[in-house]
Amino acid sequence: MSSVAVLTQESFAEHRSGLVPQQIIVATLNSEEESDPPTYKDAFPPLPEKAACLESAQEPAGAWSNKIRPIKASVITQVFHVPLEERKYKDMNQFGEGEQAKICLEIMQRTGAHLELSLAKDQGLSIMVSGKLDAVMKARKDIVARLQTQASATVPIPKEHHRFVIGKNGEKLQDLELKTATKIQIPRPDDPSNQIKITGTKEGIEKARHEVLLISAEQDKRAVKRLEVEKAFHPFIAGPYNRLVGEIMQETGTRINIPPPSVNRTEIVFTGEKEQLAQAVARIKKIYEEKKKKTTTIAVEVKKSQHKYVIGPKGNSLQEILERTGVSVEIPPSDSISETVILRGEPEKLGQALTEVYAKANSFTVSSVSAPSWLHRFIIGKKGQNLAKITHQMPKVHIEFTEGEDKITLEGPTEDVNVAQEQIEGMVKDLINRMDYVEINIDHKFHRHLIGKSGANINRIKDQYKVSVRIPPDSEKSNLIRIEGDPQGVQQAKRELLELASRMENERTKDLIIEQRFHRTIIGQKGERIREIRDKFPEVIINFPDPAQKSEIVQLRGPKNEVEKCTKYMQKMVADLVENSYSISVPIFKQFHKNIIGKGGANIKKIREESNTKIDLPAENSNSETIVITGKRANCEAARSRILSIQKDLANIAEVEVSIPAKLHNSLIGTKGRLIRSIMEECGGVHIHFPVEGSGSDTVVIRGPSSDVEKAKKQLLHLAEEKQTKSFTVDIRAKPEYHKFLIGKGGGKIRKVRDSTGARIIFPAAEDKDQDLITIIGKEDAVREAQKELEALIQNLDNVVEDYMLVDPRHHRHFVIRRGQVLREIAEEYGGVMVSFPRSGTQSDKVTLKGAKDCVEAAKKRIQEIIEDLEAQVTLECAIPQKFHRSVMGPKGSRIQQITRDYNVQIKFPDREENPVHSVEPSIQENGDEAGEGREAKETDPGSPRRCDIIVISGRKEKCEAAKEALEALVPVTIEVEVPFDLHRYIIGQKGSGIRKMMDEFEVNIHVPAPELQSHTIAITGLAANLDRAKAGLLDRVKELQAEQEDRALRSFKLSVTVDPKYHPKIIGGKGAVITQIRLEHDVNIQFPDKDDGNQPQDQITITGYEKNTEAARDAILKIVGELEQMVSEDVPLDHRVHARIIGARGKAIRKIMDEFKVDIRFPQSGAPDPNCVTVTGLPENVEEAIDHILNLEEEYLADVVDSEALQVYMKPPAHEESKAPSKGFVVRDAPWTSNSSEKAPDMSSSEEIPTFGAQVAPKTLPWGPKR
């Protein structure tokens, strides 16, 4: 069942009544406007007379009287004493020390109170506590608990009094503890003990004990009494509306608790003072005994549905009967099926009570009205407005609508229910006559499409046909749709819904298979591209799968033809995407990546734009050399060629083509490219490029430094020859830590095996999954021999031995510094051998080695070599001016790191000299003599190198000398190149971009002299190896710039054409389209005269460019002028009311006409003298045809305009004949400026007529303070 609550208009009427005074005021104002204007005195009443002012001044200006209550201070101070014998901390020599000070500080921080302590002569402690009352009380309690010795006592009080000591939520107990500064412990309710324990100071215990006993004594005076009274007599004791029991409670001061009717208990509880309680009990017993004797009962049957009317709201009807007749009415509980009502009272009053019970029972009636459930909401009306009319007239009638049932239930006073029933029946009859409903079956899968986005479709149908359409929710899976409303509207809505459903049934759904990687591209950023497709095919619904589903099915749904068109369009789009997703990888040496990128990405950006490809370079910190190019195949190939050409130009890169049969390519590449990768690594990292599989090409391209390319070519041809004759492969396994040892230093060991057996041995690359696998390839006998040798080596490595060697302790540090870097390198190189040096602090020289026998022997040999190097180590000084140090180091010290690796030496640069200028101060004297250092300085040769220039090299003598030569070779050299001064600024480039590019490309520093010097030389500083390349590059740039200068001179040829200014807009074209095409086609610049410049001839058009191109552009312009001169212009009178329709939305219609007839049509601007004059320009025959066409359109559109205007006459509201009179403004009568009286104007100098404000007056002696 569902009830409909209806808002009545009573409360609204009350609220609205507040508006009435405003309406009255408005009416008054309006009447005043119509009557005479007010007088000046009425509008501006005069100020009060002087006497009135003086009168008020007579009173005391607010004295502070005794009526004012003193404001209670928010901060209080309390002082209390702790005797010596009760102090916790007595053995303190000085106040403020030890535990006592800490405790005081803690209490102040926790409570916010301020504490001051002092010692009396008798060594007692005085404590002054200041702060807010609550904080002081808490601080006092803490001080007593922590600074004063604690005693305890027990107080026995009756168990039933304990709850009064605790109080509500324990508040009473907390207050008591704060007030007495004690801790009071009360036994738990389940503990039979009645002892209350108090802990604190003696004084506090006494106070707390007294308070507890006082509470108990108070409770001793009170008593509790329970009186058994039959439940039937409770109403007589309580009295009507509980008045009788209330009077007894008030008179005796006793609390009387009568159980409510719903609780099946008979005892009445009395609480209060013993004497008064006894009086109350006696009075109630008397009432009970009296009623028991005098009363009798009768039982009557009343329908269960009428019981609630007998009870009344909140039991008021029962109380009313009891008050009038003195009879109690007992109603059976609502969950009981009994209909018997018992009346209890004096016999003579039972008849009257019975009459009233039947009157109450029959005063209300329940009725029902038959109404189809679909009409219920129409009966209720929008926001309950229809029902509100009924309930407003009969507020006591309750109307209830039951969902799913064809009836309305009315409940209330009989007369009101009858009236309401008639009204509702009338409404139902009216609705049935003028409304209809229909139910249609449409497959539920189409329901959401019928509803439309955000309910657009269904809302349109509802509004258009004034019907209600009820579509079941998706969860019901029901096909039934119900339409309710006007019969005609219902039929029309039904027809449209069925048509929509039919159309959906005839729709075609097609699944397109599109790779998921293209979905995001088709959708576009923020859905831009898919929006364009949907705009192109608005009737087709395109659904992409959820990215998480990893599905490739894109669903299209809509009319068959549109779906087919959309399918073709999307397939073409996907084909373009596939074509544009062709990808090739180009291996480029890592050091040339920055040159391919160019300064600020200029080179790579240019290649991308010109080839229309996507180019991805590996990250700077990545070891990959591969550049990936994505786009159309032809474009990718072009981009690859350009990138390779850059690499070829930058370095001594050779490129060789080798012909190897295509059938051998896969076997040469090997599993996951392992074989070909091993050849590339062995030959200095050359790049070997095989043709695309299936192309049929035999050409293999090898690219890299010349010597490495030749080596790789020989190996590749040898391997191909082997593959052609016979190929045999064997896999063996070895622990990855053995691989470096098997390969040997610089690949020496493995090369020895290869040379002796002729087999090819391939070790796994770092990215391979199987790191244990070693592959041997070659002829069978060679492979078997190599396998035997390698397995013998691996077997030896598996035999772990432990050996030791003696190493001088002074060399130990070299091996263990930098977290054992040297030891780690030895372990990696020699099969994971473990080398253990003795702990620091011990004088042992024994070093233990553990691992494979061969690895241990090789590691011992290597350690011995290192020791020999350390013992043979020398230090060499290399003098290089400090200003070159940064250049010698290279970016991030890369050049120095390379030298230290190549020559196995250590290089130390000096600290930077902070004050390079030598001091000229006199030398310091000590004890009358010059300092020794000063004398040495004097003896130093002034030509010797400075300390800050000396670089120290440590290592073997021959290696140090080689490293010194390498360092000196890194010192930059400067050369000068002749460059004409006028080209300097072009070499520098915009914001220095040109010169920076050259410096980065050639790794040199280029210095261009200041412009004021007008020098013709440019200085280049850098390594000798780079200077020649840099000089050649600079001279090439000079040649380019000189060629550009010559080209600029040729391009600056100017030609003028004389053209009538009226033709200029046509030559320019819409948005400059025509002139832009001429400019691009002939590669010229065309300048039109400035309209605002009066000195410039307006018929001259200037063309700038190559002489040949300017002449061609001139001919193109003159050709357009020739065509324009043949054109004619005609004015046509065209009714201005149809102009907008001929022009169309955003000018679409007029553009279509102009394109169709090849004419120009100009409409008059707003405010033109003749708004109907339209100008048509073009070739004579085209103009005539265009005029005929627009005149036909005018005739057609005018008929619509006339009909529309005739209709508007009836739609307009009646015009007011009389216009409003102009507003008078604010008018007053008898104003001073309009007065004709002979009254004189006030004398401005008179202090009486114009008194002075702000003058001081002698103050009157009054009690101080404001008036209350």
Curated annotation (Swiss-Prot):
Region Disordered: start-end pairs: 910-946, 1214-1268
Modified residues (Phosphoserine): S11, S31, S35, S317, S645, S1247
Modification Phosphothreonine occurs at: T8, T295, T296
Stored PROSITE patterns: KH_TYPE_1
Location of N6-acetyllysine modifications: K991
Record-level GO BP terms: cholesterol metabolic process; lipid transport
SUPFAM superfamilies: Eukaryotic type KH-domain (KH-domain type I) (SSF54791)
Protein name: Vigilin
